[in-house]
């Protein structure tokens, strides 16, 4: 425990230094196009064997002028600017950069291709996370509520009723906020430096313990710490025997350090 606390303390110091450096660099990334270009460069560095020389996923048909990597980069750049409206993004924001992005596709094409490149985006994200935080032996798992509508409107919400019911939102309870909500539950596993390595969505009513059943497919020879909702004797034994994963509930002091770091 002493070794782990010391490692957490050092990591907190390192994160503060990185954060200060990032804030100083962000002054130069003052517009959407600058972020788009920078993110595109990063995507190219981590897309080896994922796309061809033109930056597209190999497939039949005409070669798009606006590459798949550019679709991913534009999507991430918009997220970094907290832009959640595609209409506003294409009708207003991107009009400023018509000359810089001559091959820009339409909003409908962007919407369709962003769905098709979701797997590419996730693969690049995992490679970046591994590069930033690849040698970790300690991880933290936690969840947070994702509310899709107000509790009173939950029974009238039609989301997910026409498809797979297991993926539809549901009523759930958040113990940390002591409140009920309607929506999903976001589970995430991060390392000591705060880098998210994996995540998943579940119905709000699904117990946290169910998320740990599939985690052995991605992790091995490590320690994972979570609150009591993720701890179960059967799951702990299974994870240790199959993947040498030590699943534990940390002391309050260690848990607070994890939360501050993330």
What are these regions, as identified by a protein language model?
Residues 2-262:
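Short alpha-helical elements
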């Amino acid at each position: 425990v002493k070794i782990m606390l010391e490692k957490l303390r050092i990591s907190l110091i390192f994160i503060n230094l990185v954060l200060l450096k990032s804030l100083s660099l962000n002054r130069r990334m003052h517009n959407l196009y600058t972020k788009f270009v920078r993110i595109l460069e990063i995507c190219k560095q981590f897309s080896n064997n994922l796309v061809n020389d033109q930056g597209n996923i190999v497939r039949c048909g005409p070669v798009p002028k606006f590459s798949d990597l550019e679709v991913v980069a534009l999507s991430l750049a918009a997220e970094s600017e907290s832009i959640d409206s595609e209409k506003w993004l294409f009708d207003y924001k991107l009009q400023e950069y018509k000359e810089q992005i001559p091959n820009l596709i339409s909003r409908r094409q962007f919407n369709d291709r962003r769905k098709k490149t979701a797997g590419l985006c996730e693969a690049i994200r995992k490679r970046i996370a591994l590069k930033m935080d690849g040698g970790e032996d300690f991880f933290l798992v936690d969840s947070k509520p994702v509310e899709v509508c107000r509790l009173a409107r939950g029974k009238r919400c039609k989301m997910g009723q026409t498809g797979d019911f297991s993926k539809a939102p549901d009523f759930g309870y958040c113990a940390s906020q002591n409140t009920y909500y309607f929506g999903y539950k976001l589970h995430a596993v991060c390392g000591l430096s705060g880098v998210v390595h994996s995540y998943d969505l579940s119905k709000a009513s699904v117990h946290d313990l169910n998320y740990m059943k599939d985690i052995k497919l991605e992790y091995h020879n490590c320690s994972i710490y979570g609150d009591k909702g993720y701890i179960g004797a059967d799951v702990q034994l299974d994870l240790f025997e199959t993947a040498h994963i030590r699943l534990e509930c940390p002391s309050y002091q260690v848990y607070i350090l994890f939360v501050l770091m993330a």
